[in-house]
A protein has these predicted regions:
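Membrane-interface junctions of multi-pass transporters
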Residues: 24-28, 42-88, 204-304
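Small-residue-rich segments of transmembrane alpha-helices in multi-pass membrane proteins
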Residues: 34-46, 90-104, 150-165, 209-230, ...
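Structural signature of hydrophobic alpha-helical transmembrane segments
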Residues: 1-13, 32, 53-70, 112-128, ...
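Transmembrane alpha-helical segments of multi-pass membrane transport proteins and ion-pumping complexes
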Residues: 11-19, 23, 37-41, 45, ...
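Helix-coil boundary and interhelical linker segments in multi-pass alpha-helical membrane proteins
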Residues: 1-6, 45-56, 102-116, 164-179, ...
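Transmembrane alpha-helices that form the ion-translocation and gating core
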Residues: 24, 82-141, 283-288, 296-391
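Membrane-interface helix-loop-helix junctions at boundaries between adjacent transmembrane segments
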Residues: 107-121, 130-178
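Membrane-interfacial segments at transmembrane helix termini in multi-pass membrane proteins
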Residues: 192-214, 252-271, 309, 313-343, ...
Length: 481
């Protein structure tokens, strides 16, 4: 017990320091989960050996994973996913999956069929549950980029989890996995409908949960954790992926609870999860990363990073350009949305942990894949800056003009260089103005919210102009009197 408490204290210390380190980077472009994973790998048995596996920490880690994906499941709106944007998000994920399967076959990684499937699925994921609070913090809700993340990102989390549940049970055939999965879904639907009926009937238990939701007993929060733990236990008994059980708990809560009550409850669940269990999940899961194995094969690591970007970001960007509801989005918003949908580190951690546990993937390869996920998150800010510069200079237009009139190539290059300098001056001026207003944005956030921020700035200038005009009119009127 003393050893476990000491390890937990160490983990929480690095969690606090990781959050502080993430806050020091202007615009906070790197999520703190990257720092959690780095801390776990550093403290684990393959590096410093400060923390090691234990039953108590393993249980806390499993609860953290459950709370993380319960929140993600609650944030998914099935009615929106059934709409046009959701269907297009599903089509995009299917394209990503086909590309990932082809890339996995070409790489010839020496994995079993289940291992190859797990690897391919990991390349197609989006950590939607992690992006939701990031969207909230960066005020992306209601923007075009936020809408894309809600459809494409949600499908990029839901469909990989379902695929993993079907393909990753070492003890059953795929047909048996599908049958068990259908049975599990039926049980969850029955629980949700039973909860709805109980809420509508308003029995004594329902009244107790509602009346004591804000008291010291926190009855509704306790009932929520009961639902989560019960579904995790059921999934373990049925040999299903625990991520699926956590998703199901979120779906049930969204269906049973009224919206206002659900938001209040979710805030408490997030406080419990983000305060303790979710960071422990990331640090503890990253503990098994074999740093030596990652360093021994840098070419494979670079290949995995490139695949994560090409297999997910590129198809999302092309689909946004192809489908009618997103075709007219500015290029910067498409780039930002595609790169946000590529952020998959938390789900990669969960999926590789499940794959290693099922014996479908060696721990060394899982280590490389998790590190690739972390590096892809680090690369995204660089790519957004490159994209912002490319959008400002219009290189395609410049190439077309040079091809049509080669003798004026120097003049064309000079014109586009001046355009870039002007765009850079405007970009830094706008960011400086936003910083004075207390808003700090990364390049990805700037691309996502550029139009909205310009409109807001223009409205503020108009307001100031009208206010000054009104004050001048009042001053003139007072002088006349």
């Amino acid at each position: 017990m003393t050893t476990e408490l000491a390890m937990l204290a160490t983990m929480l210390a690095v969690v606090v320091l990781s959050s502080f380190a993430a806050s020091l980077i202007p615009g906070r472009p790197i999520p703190e989960v990257v720092f959690f994973v780095a801390a776990g790998a550093t403290l684990g048995p393959h590096c410093l050996g400060v923390i090691h596996a234990s039953q108590g920490l393993a249980l806390m880690s499993r609860l953290g994973m459950g709370i993380l994906f319960l929140i993600a499941g609650y944030d998914l709106d099935l009615r929106e996913l059934a709409g046009r944007a959701g269907r297009h998000g599903a089509v995009c994920w299917a394209i990503c999956m086909a590309l990932a399967a082809a890339a996995t076959a070409l790489l010839d990684l020496g994995l079993s069929m289940a291992g190859s499937a797990a690897f391919a699925i990991a390349l197609t994921t989006t950590a939607y549950g992690t992006l939701v609070p990031i969207m909230r913090d960066r005020e992306l809700g209601g923007t075009a980029v936020g809408g894309v993340i809600e459809s494409y990102g949600a499908m990029g989390e839901l469909l990989p989890v379902v695929a993993m549940s079907i393909m990753l049970s070492p003890t059953r055939s795929m047909a048996a996995n599908i049958a068990v999965l259908v049975g599990f879904v039926v049980v969850c639907v029955m629980v949700a409908r039973g909860g709805e009926r109980a809420r509508n009937l308003g029995g004594r238990l329902v009244r107790f949960l509602s009346d004591n939701a804000e008291t010291s007993s926190q009855a509704l929060l306790r009932a929520t954790l009961l639902l989560l733990v019960a579904l995790l236990a059921l999934a373990a008994a049925l040999d299903l992926d625990a991520v699926l059980a956590a998703f199901a708990a979120g779906f049930i809560l969204r269906r049973v609870l009224p919206p206002e009550q659900g938001k209040g409850l979710l805030a408490k669940v997030e406080a419990v999860g983000n305060g303790l269990f979710i960071p422990v999940f990331f640090v503890y899961s990253a503990m098994d990363i074999d740093v030596a194995a990652v360093g021994a094969n840098p070419a494979l690591l670079a290949t995995f990073v490139a695949l994560l970007l090409l297999v997910r970001a590129l198809p999302v960007g092309l689909c946004l350009r192809a489908f009618p509801e997103t075709r007219d989005m500015p290029a910067g918003e498409k780039v930002s949305a595609a790169l946000y949908c590529t952020m998959a580190l938390p789900l990669i951690v969960a999926l590789t942990e499940a794959a290693v546990g099922a014996g479908a993937m060696p721990s060394a390869m899982a280590s490389v894949l998790v590190c690739a996920g972390a590096l892809s998150v680090l690369v995204i800010p660089v790519l957004t800056n490159i994209s912002r510069v490319a959008i400002s200079t219009s290189p395609v237009e410049a190439a077309q003009r040079i091809a049509a009139s080669p003798e004026t190539a120097r003049q064309i290059v000079h014109e586009h260089h001046e355009r870039l300098r002007e765009a850079e001056r405007a970009f830094h001026a706008e960011r400086a103005e936003l910083r004075r207003e207390g808003v700090r944005l990364s390049a990805a956030d700037y691309l996502a919210r550029a139009e909205e921020l310009r409109e807001r700035h223009a409205r503020e200038l108009r307001r100031i102009h009208e206010q000054n005009k009104h004050e001048i009119d009042e001053l003139r009127e007072s002088r006349r009197k």
